[in-house]
Each structure stands twice: as structure tokens, then as C-alpha cells.
Amino acid sequence: MLKGDSKEYNLLAKWADQLSPRDFYLSVEIGVREGYGSHVIMENLKNKNHFHIGIDPYGDITYSHVDPQPGIAPRWTDFKGNVLYNPDGSFKTPTYPNSMKQTFLTAFNKHENFILYQLEDIEYFNAFGQGVPIYYKGQKNIINNYDFVHFDGPHTTAAVLHEALFFANRSNPGTRFVFDDIDTYEIEQITQALAHYDFYLIERGKNKMCLERSNGLQKS
């Protein structure tokens, strides 16, 4: 059974479902974990020509999850809300093992228009900065424009900004960006940077926010 470690998946579903019409959609999620976010996106694109990419290194690697706050140690919880501790009693920073990847892939087998790249975001950018090959309906296409991006990997301002700028440079009019856990980093810095690419606010929840790239026409 697929599980999510975030909130407001109903908003994620709505924002994916209401994408502007086009012949083909390429979506991506950074930070797949157990796959529920990717599942929600694909369920709402299943009646359209689409392909979805998941990016997550797994492998129990450690990284900065959120912007540090002086004097405050972040407390992480499991899916049941229990605080995670190390054996010495200190707060534990979560990692995501390869076994989680296998659990996710087993539960995700009905989604055929999907590929998982077991990479860090920067490694994906280095590998596919000139486009990613998509094999779909008997054709190979090198695609370098994305229509829907869910940012749910590292939640630091620097990391999210780097990711957002990569995809902003590879976006289409109507492309939507969804940001998760927006209270853990300086989301205003992200939105200000993306305004230069004509991204504007569609909707903001308590946990998630959606921006869309303008088609160049004046917005009401």
C-alpha cells in the first residue's frame, strides 16, 4: 500500500488534474519516498498522454532536510507521528533505504508510464540537462521541457531554488510547479526568482503551494 509522508494531497491532485490542455505531459517528482505523491500525479493524468519521472537516490544517504534554525534541533517523526531517536537518545535525521524503493516499486507496478532515476537532483541535472529520453508508444523522444514538477526532496532554500531554476529554464507556458512543506524554507525567495520566468501563484495551502507559468497574456 502506498503511503505519503506529507499533507494536502487533495491539492496536489487538483493541480495536476487542472493542467492546461496539451498533446503530451511530462511530469516529475523530486523526492519519491514511498511513492504516494507520484501516484496522485499519475492518477490525475492517466486519461491523458503522459509520462512521469521520479528522482530519488534512496540508499540511506544523509543530507540537509530543512534550513537550520539557530538553537533548534529539528524533530522528525515516522508515519504514525512518533518522534525518531538515535540509540543515544538524540534526535534522528531520517534517511531512506533501498528497501523503501523496492516496496514502492512493488506497489507501483500498475503505472507503466513511469521511470525512477535513483539519483540526487544534481546528478539528474548533470545527466539530463540537454534532455531526457522518453520511450513511449513506439517512439523515442529527447524531451527538455516539463509540464508539472512536484518539489518534495531536500527542503532547504538553496536546494529548492537550484531545482526550481533548472526546471524553470525547461518549462512551457502553463507548466505548474508544486512546492511541499513551504514553511521549512524561504518560499518567498523562490517565488521572487520564478517571477522572472513569468510564474505566478495559483493557490497556496498550509503545506503546499502551486505556481503556473503564464502564457504571456495579461492575467486577471
Enumerate the predicted regions with their spans.
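S-adenosylmethionine/decaboxylated-SAM
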Residues: 3, 10-220
